[in-house]
Amino acid sequence: MLNFACDYLDAAHPKVFEALMKNNFVKTGCYDESESDCFCNAAREKIRAACGVPDAEVRFLSGGTQTNKVVISTMLKPWQGVIAARTGHIAVHEAGAIEASGHKVIEIAEHQGKISAEAVDKVFRAWHGDGNRLHMVEPGMVYITQPTEYGTVYSLAELTALSEVCRRWGVPLYVDG
């Protein structure tokens, strides 16, 4: 049976342990992101190079819930919420972390964990068409998990369609995976 509950509650691949053992006695910094941590510094440089921003500030977080809360609360304005599948990770498994930051999770219907571009577009059209929208949570981001909580995977066509809807409405598409 395949279980997609959590990627850090299962055994690690033997090659992961080999890599850890190979570097087990390398001394690195702790409690800060000092220059003494060669592994984090190497990762920062790879991220900067991949993004094409050589002077970018790169920070590392310890877990997915913390990361989702920081990213979502930073990208949304105070009056905005995030659209997510009713079964999405931020709607079900993160103990209200997003709502604790003051942002509503706008849950929408899904099929096997996936939300459709049409359903997302409908949320934006409904909000923009409502004469009372100034008193409502504005959808400011779309959140998906890849793979979903059911283990289903968005196809390239589905991702492209979601991305196009997000671009049309001027909001980010956040992929948690």
Which residues fall in each region the model found?
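Hydrophobic beta-strand scaffold residues
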Residues: 82, 105-106, 173-175
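Conserved N-terminal alpha-helix of the aminotransferase class I/II PLP-enzyme fold
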Residues: 13-64, 86-91, 97
